[in-house]
Amino acid sequence: MKILADENMPYVEQLFGDLGTIEAVNGRTLTSEQVKDADVLLVRSVTKVNQALLSLNTNLKFVGSATIGTDHIDQSYLASQGIPFTNAPGCNATAVGEFAFIAMLELAKRFDTELKGKVVGIVGAGNTGSAVAKCLEAYGVEVLLNDPLIEADDPRTFVSLEALTERADVISLHVPLTKDGAHKTWYLFDEQRLQNLKPDTWLLNCCRGEVIDNRALIKIKAQRPDIKLVLDVWEGEPEPMLELVPFVELATPHIAGYSLEGKARGTYMLYQKLMAVLGIDADKSMTSLLPTLWSQQVSLDELPSEKALLQLSRFVYDLRDDDELFRKTLLDDSSIKAGENSANNNGFDLMRKNHKHRREFSALKLASAGQSDVDWLLNLGFSGVGR
């Protein structure tokens, strides 16, 4: 069996190596010629899987995408050819949730304010949006949810997008990218909606770049410096609008979901599904793939301080490092060839490929001899909190 896998997908050899020959490929430049002899195709969001890509293949038995979203997959075509497909819903939800939470803590520190006491609106209450809400609610932050696609069958309380933008001090976007329908999300935040944001709004996008009209965002930010931006996704990836970057407080190259746990979870979910398709028992465990937990003795009595919580979060992941690398890579004049977007030269994709996958809060095992109520730290995701 020939297994074609994105070169940036971890643990493929450990999980799929017994099944056949594995060939690692560049997912963004994958061609029909490369795919023609594959029995299994494992991709990420940078690969568009459609009739054109699969036109030379008559042997494909399975397509798996280690992603939450599926807008890069022509599922109708796969179904018409009888090719089983699965993605990995929720695989990196915890990573995205913690990324957004840490970004909010960083903004609070930078602008000498407190996250606790603000109202946070979450647009899109699926796996990733719910993970953000989980962190915020564990910390005691008021959360508003907007998701017209699920609210009819979901017991949680929802508000309209208009009500959310009127009330929320912070807005975090977690929707799939859809171009059609009553609830399309392409340019959901267009020039008018951006202009109508309340003063001093923090706007975070960790889903798809085109959910915000980036050209309009440049225009609005020039007029409204009070709006603070955190962008992990960009219109036109892997060539973001470089003129937007200086307007962004925290800028990263679509790596919000890049935790070691999240990446392992995504690959493992594809492994489980393929084994089911093949009728073979999945006898490998995900926990065996991951390094052991870190241990850290901390004074939990100090953690009610938001700055102390930020320091603990930075021990797991310091978002400022990725922001600095992003700016250095894409805006460093010495790296820009005349007449070319620097993303083409040293780029966006290279940062993603070489990203050192961070750990999630659960990788940090805390211990304390103090008497503080620490249940909220367990709810936030940290491991082994005890006395």
Swiss-Prot record:
It catalyses: 4-phospho-D-erythronate + NAD(+) = (R)-3-hydroxy-2-oxo-4-phosphooxybutanoate + NADH + H(+). The active site is at R208, E237, H254. Keywords: Cytoplasm, NAD, Oxidoreductase, Pyridoxine biosynthesis. It is found in: Cytoplasm. NAD(+) binds at D147, D232, G257. GO terms for molecular function: 4-phosphoerythronate dehydrogenase activity; glyoxylate reductase (NADPH) activity; hydroxypyruvate reductase [NAD(P)H] activity; NAD binding; protein dimerization activity. Signal peptide: none annotated. Belongs to the D-isomer specific 2-hydroxyacid dehydrogenase family. PdxB subfamily. This is Erythronate-4-phosphate dehydrogenase. It comes from Shewanella sediminis (strain HAW-EB3). The lineage of its organism: Bacteria, Pseudomonadati, Pseudomonadota, Gammaproteobacteria, Alteromonadales. The gene is pdxB.
